């Protein structure tokens, strides 16, 4: 989804190295040192404007979080939320989901979130979907044995595609929600898009899948 370009976004990121990891390839294998503790590390690929990642970090101070996005303007909005919250357990980085193995060592990440990823509905764009096999190959490397992906979307076609992709890869579908907001799931933290879509009456789908 295209986002309006934000003036000064790049400089905003560069001026806040406490929260934005500008050269993540240089800290590969040393993320615990970045956070200054040995707490588990969870990442969100496609973190958008940061509502989810900051919400999770506030609820779970015993876990470290990294929000990852490929769009400079979007990540700059996430940085605003991080600066407002002053949370010590959240970092941000500008990166593509297909390159994560360059920034994280094998098994360095404990859990991975995918929230409202671009569905790339056209067949010729299938390889761009964040639940395509090549992405799963990458996620498997940086997650531990039996590591988990928590995936959430409002797009039924992408959800069904992702369930099939996970299953064909040999992953276990631990829990599946066909209408998250109508369920008794208590630990949900909404993204900006999730609130917008749910207010329009759209169903939200969620799955927890394990390698």
Swiss-Prot record:
Enumerate the InterPro entries for this protein. SAM-dependent_MTases_sf, tRNA_(Gua-N-7)_MeTrfase_Trmb, tRNA_methyltr_TrmB_bact
Question: Do the record's keywords include Transferase?
Answer: yes
**Active site, renumbered:** 118
Q: Where does substrate bind?
A: 122, 154, 191-194
Q: Where on the tree of life does the source sit, at the highest rank?
A: Bacteria
**Residues engaged in binding S-adenosyl-L-methionine:** 44, 69, 96, 118
What top-tier enzyme class does this entry carry?
transferase
One Gene Ontology MF term: tRNA (guanine(46)-N7)-methyltransferase activity
The Enzyme Commission number assigned here is 2.1.1.33
Its biological purpose: Catalyzes the formation of N(7)-methylguanine at position 46 (m7G46) in tRNA.
Provide the protein name.
tRNA (guanine-N(7)-)-methyltransferase
